[in-house]
Each structure stands twice: as structure tokens, then as C-alpha cells.
UniProtKB/Swiss-Prot annotation:
Residues 110-121 have a biased composition (Basic residues). One of its GO terms (biological process) is translation. Located at the top of the head of the 30S subunit, it contacts several helices of the 16S rRNA. In the 70S ribosome it contacts the 23S rRNA (bridge B1a) and protein L5 of the 50S subunit (bridge B1b), connecting the 2 subunits; these bridges are implicated in subunit movement. Contacts the tRNAs in the A and P-sites. This is Small ribosomal subunit protein uS13. Part of the 30S ribosomal subunit. Forms a loose heterodimer with protein S19. Forms two bridges to the 50S subunit in the 70S ribosome.
Amino acid sequence: MVRIAGVNVPDRKHAVVALMSIYGIGKSRARSICLNTGIDEHVQLCKLSEIHIDKLRDAVDEYIVEGDLRREVTLNIKRLIDLGTYRGLRHRRNLPVRGQRTRTNARTCKGPRKSMNKQFK
């Protein structure tokens, strides 16, 4: 296991796939990191020298990833809630934020159905 940005990255996988295991790095960002550092996307991390791995570490450190990114997202949501915006209200009520319909669907956001338990007898 190679440690990059505080994460144990699997070294038996290709460089792009291994970098994608870091929170905040997707496929396109992983490819651009490999391109900028001059590392082939399809080489396994265990076959790279320590110099190349250090280059990867330095390239990943330029981005906001892992705990810092999670904290930033949480603070952004908290800021919306504190400001009392519509989006903050939707976050506080655990409803869809981006204008999706809620009359049907939205089960993931709303949680399991609340049954009506013979209220209308």
C-alpha cells in the first residue's frame, strides 16, 4: 500500500484507478495528474519508483482532498442553513435541494415511508 494524502492507496491497481480511491479525485482529475507528472495511466503503482510516487504526492497535494474537502462541503451546507436560504431549508429538512420533484420519487432523500397506521378510520 502506498500512502498519498493520508490515504492508503492500493498499489496493485493502475495509477488512475488508485488515485480515484482518494476522496475528491475523480477520473478526469486522476488522468490530468498522471499527465502532468508524466506517469503512464496504466502502470501499477507498485512498479513505480519512489521518485514517481513523490511526484504523485506533490501533484495531489495541490488539490483540496479528503478531510479538508469534506470539511469545506460541510461548512458550505452549514453556511446555507445559517443564512436561512431556500437551499439551506431544504438541507435542514432532508429534502432534494436542486429542484427535483417530491410528490413521487425522492425516496432516498426523504428516507423510508412513514405509514399512516389507521389514522383515518
